[in-house]
């Protein structure tokens, strides 16, 4: 089975700042994975590598492969990888209607523009995806009039419209109240139970659904651990990762943290 992501000895800069030096990381498609780390650990840069927004420094001894390929046309990559990020929600076109939010996924744009066109099959696919997520009554509503949770679910539908092999979720419950968080996480769990692979990027342990089995710890631009969730998510490891005393409590398959 192909690896979702394979990085070897990659050095990556954001502007003049080096975020990764000789980074090596594998994420397999045989299971769902959570990438955990404090702010500044390199999580956002890793997401940009996945989405081909940035590239590593060229070297004959390094590579970044996504589904075993180093070079992608971004529009083709979206058929394999659907990304839902908090930053996209913040920057999305406010006056876009619900249907157009989902249709924009076919172009990877943050709105629908006059030069874009859609086939009947694409429109029907968008509508069926909206319906599957229980959003059909909002199909004609403007994005800016929706609740944060409704917006997040429309962006999830936008990512799903290609039926990608893998969903990448960046801090999935950020900005959501408890009720919306629980509903959104249940949607994610439903997708995983139906066979969808998830890569979840977060610094909030409570966002990690029980179905995720693999964990990557990222700190200061380095992978400090990569292994099974039940072995890595413990009080000592998280205390070391976040450099503050933490106690871990497990309930109903979820992990919670409290001050140590």
Segments predicted by a language model, with ranges:
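Conserved ABC ATPase signature
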Residues: 116-118, 142-146
């Amino acid at each position: 089975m192909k690896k979702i992501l394979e990085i070897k000895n990659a050095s990556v800069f954001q502007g003049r700042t080096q975020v990764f030096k000789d980074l090596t990381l594998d994420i397999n498609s045989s299971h769902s994975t959570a990438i955990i780390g404090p702010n500044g650990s390199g999580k956002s840069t890793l997401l940009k590598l996945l989405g081909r927004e940035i590239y590593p420094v060229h070297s004959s001894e390094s590579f970044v492969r996504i589904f075993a390929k180093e070079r992608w046309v971004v529009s083709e990559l979206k058929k394999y990888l659907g990304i839902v990020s908090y930053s996209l929600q913040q920057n999305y076109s406010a006056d876009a209607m619900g249907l157009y939010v989902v249709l924009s996924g076919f172009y990877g744009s943050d709105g629908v523009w006059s030069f874009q066109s859609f086939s009947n099959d694409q429109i029907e696919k968008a509508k069926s995806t909206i319906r599957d997520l229980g959003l059909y009554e909002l199909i004609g509503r403007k994005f800016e009039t929706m609740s944060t949770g409704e917006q997040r679910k429309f962006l999830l539908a936008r990512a799903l419209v290609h039926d990608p092999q893998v969903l990448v979720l960046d801090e999935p419950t950020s900005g959501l109240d408890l009720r919306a968080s629980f509903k959104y996480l249940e949607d994610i769990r439903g997708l995983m139970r139906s066979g969808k692979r998830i890569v979840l990027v977060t610094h909030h342990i409570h966002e990690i659904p029980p179905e995720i089995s693999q964990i990557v710890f990222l700190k200061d631009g380095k992978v400090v651990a990569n292994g099974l969730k039940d072995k890595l998510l413990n009080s000592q490891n998280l205390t070391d990762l976040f450099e503050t005393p933490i106690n871990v409590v497990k309930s109903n398959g979820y992990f919670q943290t409290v001050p140590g």
